[in-house]
Amino acid sequence: MSDQALSTFDRAREALDKKTRYVQDFPEKGVLFEDLTPVLGDAESFAAVVDAMAEAAEKLNAEIIGGLDARGFLLGSAVAYKLGLGVLAIRKKGKLPPPVVTQEYELEYGTAALELPSEGIDIAGKNIVLIDDVLATGGTLGAARKLIESCDGHVSGYVLAIEVPGLGGRDNLGARPVIVVRDPQ
């Protein structure tokens, strides 16, 4: 990496370290939740994280940015704008009018689904970089990859702000590059 790349990522890591709010026992006992809302709400911190994510997405040859519902929308839109690319909003089931393409995936206690419009957006053959705030189990990102592939798009990699260690999230992402702005602590 160049000196510029290191300084971009260092600024983003510093912003994440300074502004992330930690909430013990949320959403359940034993979990330390990392709330990025203060990072997103601070212009300088938000810009630092977006700059690092945009640099990573550019290295992954992004042609379209895929943002996952909901914080991935915020980060993905900003990254797409910075790079002069379009953004693909990957929605939770039931949020888009038909017709849609749906991909179900397993949750700890049930199933969920992601959707894309089946009309109006042509992603066939395009390199799509998926962006979200957190990599945990990788279930949602893995489902997003399958959804895009079912529409003949190509996921060229993943860019995340943070990663929760010990949950095996990368195992669900297939053989694609994963770039995390702040390495697991």
From Swiss-Prot:
GO molecular function list: adenine binding; adenine phosphoribosyltransferase activity; AMP binding
Pathway: Purine metabolism; AMP biosynthesis via salvage pathway; AMP from adenine: step 1/1
Keywords noted in UniProt: Cytoplasm, Glycosyltransferase, Purine salvage, Transferase
One annotated Gene Ontology cellular component of this protein: cytoplasm
CDD domains: PRTases_typeI
Reaction catalysis annotation: AMP + diphosphate = 5-phospho-alpha-D-ribose 1-diphosphate + adenine
Record EC number: 2.4.2.7
Localization, UniProt: Cytoplasm
Broad class of the protein's primary localization: cytoplasm
Annotated S-S bridges: none
SUPFAM superfamilies: PRTase-like (SSF53271)
Biological role: Catalyzes a salvage reaction resulting in the formation of AMP, that is energically less costly than de novo synthesis.
Entries under PANTHER family matching the protein: ADENINE PHOSPHORIBOSYLTRANSFERASE
Similarity-based family: Belongs to the purine/pyrimidine phosphoribosyltransferase family.
Protein name as catalogued: Adenine phosphoribosyltransferase
Gene from which this protein is expressed: apt
